[in-house]
Every structure is written in C-alpha cells, then in structure tokens.
C-alpha cells in the first residue's frame, strides 16, 4: 500500500512538472513567434512604447479645446495604444496617425478606462465619434468614413466639451 501511494505521489509530481514545462514552452513559443519590433498585445503586462507627446487642439462651436497627446505613428505604437493604463490626466489623449485615410475600427482589448474614440479625416475634420467605449470590450467600433487619424480621450469628454463630427482638429499631421 505504501509503494502504491509513493507511486501515485511520484506520478502526480511528474505530471505537474511536465504541465509546468509545457506552459513555459508555449509562452516562450508565442513570444518567439511575435515579429521583431512588435508589441505582444496578448501579454498581460506588455511594456508600453516610449510615446512622444505633442500639442493638439480642436476647434468646435464651444471654442478651442487644448490637449496634450501621445503620438502613435508606427505599427508597434498603434497596436499598443492605451492598453494596460488605468488612468489618464485631464486634457491628455493619444493620437493614432495612419499612412493613408481609410475606414478604421478600434476595440478596447486590455483597455482599463472608458474612451471616446474620435475619427479624423484627411481634411482634419472629425468624421465620427464612438463615445464612451467600454473597457475590455472587443467589439469593433468603426469610423463612419475614411480616417487618417484617431484621437482617444477619456470617455465622456467629447460630449462634455461639445466636440462633434465636423469640428476641425489642429495638429502638425494636418500641416497646421
């Protein structure tokens, strides 16, 4: 009976060690499969790229609204965006810059705070706004037309500040 118990314990230990090694290998394999220079968006605590911060302002019926925005203008920065952040200072946001205007769609994977997603056309006008996008929701939130830029600000701020489709966004990316 004692030998049977020892065999059972040994089998359980070996099985546990084997499963642990498989999990490590799977994680390492996934990391190794990620292209060089890309952020692994599935990593639970992916390292945030170093974003440059620049001024941006919106010309609306309510007047001039100033923001400091982090710039996401390459694939790694655009893929990471505001994921894993739990807060954002008032008057701050992130501007995603794309090489050409086209229909865009964003989601809220690994995003802890609600956001207003503001789609901006090549003419610097707001095309559409997806207001109060829900944290962690992976539903695609599309633009209502081609967009070359996407501004993310804290959820509810666009309505609170009177920002609407048709308003003009001023930033260097629009030659302003």
What are the residue ranges of the model-derived segments?
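C-terminal motif of bacterial Sec signal peptides marking the signal peptidase cleavage site
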Residues: 20-23
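Compact, glycine-rich, soluble single-domain proteins
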Residues: 25-176
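Bacterial N-terminal signal peptides that target proteins for export
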Residues: 1-12
């Amino acid at each position: 009976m004692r030998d049977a118990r020892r065999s059972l314990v040994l089998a359980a230990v070996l099985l546990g060690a084997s499963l642990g090694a498989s999990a490590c290998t799977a994680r390492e394999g996934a990391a190794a499969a990620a292209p060089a220079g890309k952020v692994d968006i599935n990593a639970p605590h992916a390292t945030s790229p170093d974003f440059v911060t620049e001024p941006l302002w919106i010309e609306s019926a309510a007047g001039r609204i100033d923001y400091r925005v982090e710039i996401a203008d390459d694939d790694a920065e655009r893929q990471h965006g505001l994921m894993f952040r739990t807060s954002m200072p008032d008057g701050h946001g992130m501007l995603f810059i794309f090489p050409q205007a086209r229909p865009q769609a964003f989601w809220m994977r690994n995003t802890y705070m609600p956001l207003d997603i503001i789609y901006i056309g090549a003419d610097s006008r707001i095309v559409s706004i997806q207001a109060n996008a829900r944290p962690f929701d992976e539903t695609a939130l599309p633009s209502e037309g081609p967009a070359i830029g996407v501004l993310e600000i804290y959820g509810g701020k666009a309505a609170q500040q009177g920002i609407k489709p048709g308003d003009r966004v001023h930033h260097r990316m629009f030659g302003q």
